[in-house]
């Protein structure tokens, strides 16, 4: 018979043990067991452990059941009384099995919440484990030690504390290294190695895999912490740098303010001293005046006749009075002079400029500089004023700075400034920087707030004082005087010379040339050859400029005339080509009977001159022989008959003998090419051209179109 031992385990309650026999009864000690192999299965939470064995010793089974029940009761009572802290397994370890002997005890099952199936191959091992559990149940210390022992994959509190302290110490050090308590082979100390050796191969691989995953997670966290620490360190360094820079700026501003305050204090102390002296002198004068008033009042009150000594004092008294009056005059003069000096040294508006509007009062625009650049007062008026100068571009935007004019210089380049030309430049100062700029780079716009603050910072950093309101008022007055300046003849001559010096060409070449010729003649008369040579060079230069301007002026005109002449020649050539082509077409054209031709009648009698006709007849007779053309003498006779001056007898003879007229020999074999005869026939039939241009005859269709019939 085979017997089975089932051990059930609940999640929250105490462990309960049931041993079903082969016949289905629980707890009967008489069950027998047969078989040579045993199998143990452990399920999660509501699992059961089933042990099949074929040992013949039934008494050992009963003892084992009793020992297991007693052990479970003891563990429950001990846990209720003592309630010792149980170390929880690590979250990252997924191993739920172990090779320890506590798996066969109920105490260890009470502490654990999960388990895995396990097989026992030998019967002797089961007996040894049962004996061990029995011995452990008998001793409370052993059971408590076993219950408090950490499971596989768990980390004890001491280990966690040590690891946390080590991590803190490592984090405090700069060269931190990752360490999770295991070596490179994922094994710990000797106890850990022994415990892993006791596991099966599958459990060992699972445990190592869990450790690898845990190591990766911890390593990732370690790297993230390290990066965060480095970032925090960088932020701290940057903050420290910023704080140091701010402190330096504050120190500079404090130093500058202290300098300004010390200077103001010195000025105030001097002013107070002068005020004290002045107040003392005034008090003395007041006291003397009061004394005099008191004396006169006493004398009037007494109304007694005045003595000569009282009215006319002695010389000594007069001298004393004179001395006192001189002293009072001196004190008043000194006080007035002190006041004047104080006004000069410490004007009422001695405060430095604080707004861009105040500085804009002495700003010069490019338009003003263009008007004044040739004036005699230019250098004097401009020095001390301010301009808005362009220094270049930044991100495709122009950049301007506030600069003070310290002087006027002449540059090597002559440039165009509006409607005039000049070579003058402004020497500008911005803080410690000084540079020469041309007038064309000055802006017409006013100073902005940002530009004003930039200039103010540059002045403070250079340790220079800002201009006061009194200086600005004085400069503004000088600008107004320049606007209302009255010119004299000498100023006008200087302005004209200055403008002519930079002018490319004179406004009137003829006038300039005549003036130079006069000067040359005067120099030659006086015998000054050097001056005459200089004037001749000027004349040559003037002629060259005039020729260059003439070439430039007539350049376009000559080009246009050349184009017109070329077009005319081309039109003539094209018209000749068209005439030749039309004549060829006329020759090759066949006769059209429907074409209307010009048929202007001609009077035969008046058609030709008789002398010309006789010459033609003589040529024809010489070529073809006499009597070839009978029509010619006939026409001749007709013409002579009509004419009154001709002989009537010859005409009557020709008209009477008609047979003789037709009695002549005709040569048929003529040595004339056919092409020539054809050409003669065509030319004779063609209408005469008018004005040398061919004229095409109208056909019926063109005629109807012109008349509006079609």
Curated annotation (Swiss-Prot):
Mark out the compositionally biased spans (Acidic residues). Answer: 53-65, 312-323
List UniProt keywords, sorted A-Z: Activator, Coiled coil, DNA-binding, Nucleus, Phosphoprotein, Transcription, Transcription regulation, Wnt signaling pathway
Transmembrane segment boundaries? none
Subcellular locations according to the entry: Nucleus, Nucleoplasm
Task: List the molecular function annotations (GO) for this entry.
Answer: RNA binding; single-stranded DNA binding
Please report a single Pfam family linked to this protein.
Answer: Plus-3
Give any single GO term for biological process. transcription elongation by RNA polymerase II
Q: Which SMART domains does the UniProt entry name for this protein? A: Plus3 (SM00719)
Coiled coil regions in record = 526-560
The biased composition feature labelled Low complexity covers: 158-170
Where Phosphothreonine occurs, the residues are 55
Biased composition annotated in UniProt, kind: Basic residues: 110-130, 228-240
Query: What residues does the Plus3 domain cover?
Result: 353-484
Q: Where is the composition biased (Gly residues)?
A: 24-33
**Sequence positions bearing Phosphoserine:** 53, 626, 650, 655, 697
Is Translocase set as a keyword in this record? no
Instruction: Share what the entry says about its subunit structure, partners included.
Output: Component of the PAF1 complex, which consists of CDC73, PAF1, LEO1, CTR9, RTF1 and SKIC8; the association of RTF1 appears to be less stable than that of other subunits. At least in HeLa cells a N-terminal shorter form of RTF1 is also found in the complex. The PAF1 complex interacts with PHF5A.
Q: What does this protein do?
A: Component of the PAF1 complex (PAF1C) which has multiple functions during transcription by RNA polymerase II and is implicated in regulation of development and maintenance of embryonic stem cell pluripotency. PAF1C associates with RNA polymerase II through interaction with POLR2A CTD non-phosphorylated and 'Ser-2'- and 'Ser-5'-phosphorylated forms and is involved in transcriptional elongation, acting both independently and synergistically with TCEA1 and in cooperation with the DSIF complex and HTATSF1. PAF1C is required for transcription of Hox and Wnt target genes.
Entry domain remark: The Plus3 domain mediates single-stranded DNA-binding.
Q: Under which name does UniProt file this protein?
A: RNA polymerase-associated protein RTF1 homolog
């Amino acid at each position: 018979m085979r017997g089975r031992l089932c051990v059930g385990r609940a999640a929250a309650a105490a462990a309960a043990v049931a041993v079903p026999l082969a016949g289905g009864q629980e707890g009967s000690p008489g069950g027998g067991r047969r078989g040579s192999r045993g199998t143990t299965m452990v399920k999660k939470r509501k699992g059961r452990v089933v042990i099949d064995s074929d040992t013949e010793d039934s008494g050992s089974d009963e003892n084992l059941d009793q020992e297991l029940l007693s052990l479970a009761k003891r563990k429950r009572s001990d846990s209720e009384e003592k309630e010792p802290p149980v170390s929880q397994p690590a979250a990252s370890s997924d191993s739920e099995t172990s090779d320890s002997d506590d798996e066969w005890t109920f105490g260890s099952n009470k502490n654990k919440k999960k388990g895995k199936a396990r097989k026992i191959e030998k019967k002797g091992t089961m007996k040894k484990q049962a004996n061990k559990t029995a011995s452990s149940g008998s001793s409370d210390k052993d059971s408590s030690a076993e219950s408090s022992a950490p499971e596989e994959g768990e980390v004890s509190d001491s280990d966690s504390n040590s690891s946390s302290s080590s991590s803190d110490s490592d984090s405090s050090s700069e060269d931190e290294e990752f360490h999770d308590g295991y070596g490179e082979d994922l094994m710990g100390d000797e106890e850990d190695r022994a415990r892993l050796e006791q596991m099966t191969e599958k459990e060992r691989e699972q445990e190592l895999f869990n450790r690898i995953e845990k190591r990766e997670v911890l390593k990732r966290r370690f790297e993230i912490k390290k990066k965060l620490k480095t970032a925090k360190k960088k932020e701290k360094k940057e903050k420290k740098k910023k704080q140091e820079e701010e402190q330096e700026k504050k120190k500079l501003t404090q130093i500058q303010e202290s300098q300004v305050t010390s200077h103001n204090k010195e000025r105030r102390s001097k002013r107070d001293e002068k005020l004290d002296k002045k107040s003392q002198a005034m008090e003395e004068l007041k006291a003397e005046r009061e004394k005099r008033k008191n004396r006169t009042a006493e004398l009037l009150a007494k109304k007694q006749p005045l003595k000569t000594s009282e009215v006319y004092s002695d010389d000594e008294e007069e001298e004393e009075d004179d001395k006192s009056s001189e002293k009072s005059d001196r004190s008043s003069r000194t006080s007035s002079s002190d006041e004047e000096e104080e006004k000069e040294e410490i004007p009422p508006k001695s405060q430095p400029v604080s707004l861009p509007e105040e500085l804009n009062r002495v700003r010069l625009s490019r338009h003003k500089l263009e008007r004044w650049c040739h004036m005699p007062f230019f250098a004097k008026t401009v020095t001390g004023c301010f301009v808005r100068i362009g220094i270049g571009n930044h991100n495709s935007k122009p950049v301007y700075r506030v600069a003070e004019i310290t002087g006027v210089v002449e540059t090597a380049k002559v440039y165009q400034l509006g409607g005039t030309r000049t070579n003058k430049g402004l020497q500008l100062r911005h803080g410690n920087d000084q540079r020469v700029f041309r007038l064309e780079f000055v802006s017409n716009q006013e100073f902005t707030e940002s530009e004003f603050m930039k200039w103010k910072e540059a002045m403070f950093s250079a340790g220079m004082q800002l201009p006061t309101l009194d200086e600005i008022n004085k400069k503004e007055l000088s600008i107004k005087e320049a606007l209302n300046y009255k010119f004299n003849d000498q100023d006008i001559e200087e302005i004209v010379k200055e403008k002519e010096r930079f002018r490319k060409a004179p406004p009137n070449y003829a006038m300039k040339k005549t003036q130079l010729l006069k000067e040359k003649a005067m120099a030659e008369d006086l015998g000054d050859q050097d001056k005459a040579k200089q004037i001749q060079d000027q004349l040559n230069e003037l002629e060259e400029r005039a020729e260059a301007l003439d070439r430039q002026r007539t350049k376009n005109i000559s080009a246009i005339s050349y184009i017109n002449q070329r077009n005319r020649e081309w039109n003539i050539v094209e018209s000749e080509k068209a005439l030749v082509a039309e004549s060829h077409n006329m020759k090759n054209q066949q006769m059209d009977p429907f074409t209307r031709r010009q048929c202007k009648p001609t009077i035969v009698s008046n058609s030709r001159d008789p002398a010309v006709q006789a010459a033609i007849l003589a040529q024809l007779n010489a070529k073809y022989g006499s009597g070839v053309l009978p029509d010619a003498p006939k026409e001749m006779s007709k013409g002579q008959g009509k004419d009154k001056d001709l002989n009537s007898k010859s005409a009557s003879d020709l008209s009477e003998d008609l047979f003789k007229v037709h009695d002549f020999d005709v040569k048929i074999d003529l040595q004339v090419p056919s092409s020539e005869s054809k050409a003669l026939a065509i030319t004779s039939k063609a209408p005469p051209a008018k004005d040398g241009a061919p004229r095409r005859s109208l056909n019926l269709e063109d005629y109807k179109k012109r008349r509006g019939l079609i």
